[in-house]
């Protein structure tokens, strides 16, 4: 059960605690070999907004352990749940990032994610510094929100002000 604090729930469900899961260490070609996908499929995930790769100073894509786990999750959503890339984006767009981050009301009104149900916040803020000065790829909503796909209804019911389901 998630409990009362959705942000804490997301952090508790973070993948592989105890290692630096954000350290870019894997080239896109190595990631393709590990995942069994092609380089072009991984680039397609990036261009669709499903994943934010690290970029070196020379603009070379690099992945971290968390990126590999995210790719595995995307593959699971495609193969086991029958979603396509657009379906995954729309599902992730339902995550109320403003609740997880406890955004101030004035920030919420300016936030494009508050008014768009088709793209997750990190896609809407692409090319920007993210929200509240935090880079999207380091934000807990981007990093861990995707993992709550199975528990989305429970997650949404646990948010402050949400209507509780009747037993």
Placement of each model-derived feature along the sequence:
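Functionally constrained cores in energy, signaling, and assembly domains
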Residues: 31, 35-39, 44, 63
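Arg/Lys-rich, alpha-helical DNA-contact motif
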Residues: 2-28, 33-34, 52-58, 65-167
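Major-groove DNA-recognition helix of helix-turn-helix-type DNA-binding domains
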Residues: 39-58
């Amino acid at each position: 059960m998630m409990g009362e604090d959705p942000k804490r729930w997301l952090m508790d469900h973070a993948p592989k605690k105890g290692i630096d899961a954000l350290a870019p260490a894997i080239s896109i070609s190595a990631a393709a070999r590990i995942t069994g996908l092609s380089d072009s499929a991984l680039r397609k995930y990036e261009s669709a907004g499903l994943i934010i790769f690290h970029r070196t100073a020379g603009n070379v894509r690099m992945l971290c352990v968390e990126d590999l786990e995210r790719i595995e999750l995307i593959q699971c959503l495609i193969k086991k749940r029958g979603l396509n890339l657009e379906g995954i984006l729309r599902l992730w767009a339902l995550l109320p990032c403003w609740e997880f981050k406890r955004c101030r009301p004035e920030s919420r009104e300016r936030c494009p994610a508050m008014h768009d149900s088709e793209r997750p916040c990190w896609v809407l803020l692409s090319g920007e510094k993210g929200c509240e000065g935090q880079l999207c790829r380091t934000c807990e909503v981007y990093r861990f929100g995707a993992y709550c796909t199975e528990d989305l209804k429970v997650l949404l019911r646990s948010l402050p002000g949400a209507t509780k389901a009747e037993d």
